[in-house]
């Protein structure tokens, strides 16, 4: 999970969830996208081996707070997760220590595709302007 990037489409600005979020909730929203696994990863969850799929991750409220910053409280994070569930952005399954978060429709928005390079394609000439 340490490397890579995520896609954030401009259409997000028109999304009702985004429009109804506070600045703090938007920080949490983007942070959750950044925390999600981009490929399968093995975890132990509720005492059992679990394979986290792309768009899922195991975390805690405290861990989210460490990533978003101390200015955002655990209560704000908890309320944001509840709001994100109502808007069907994510699902959150918690135990007394950890929480499995699944970003809904992850594959639809974050599917791997060819990454553009600075190199010209074979059917296009390079120019020196």
Predicted region positions:
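Short alpha-helix boundary/capping elements
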Residues: 33-40, 111
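Feature primarily recognizes SF3-like P-loop helicase cores of small DNA viruses
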Residues: 10-13, 33
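Charged low-complexity intrinsically disordered patches
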Residues: 105-129
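Short helix-coil-helix linker/hinge
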Residues: 22-25
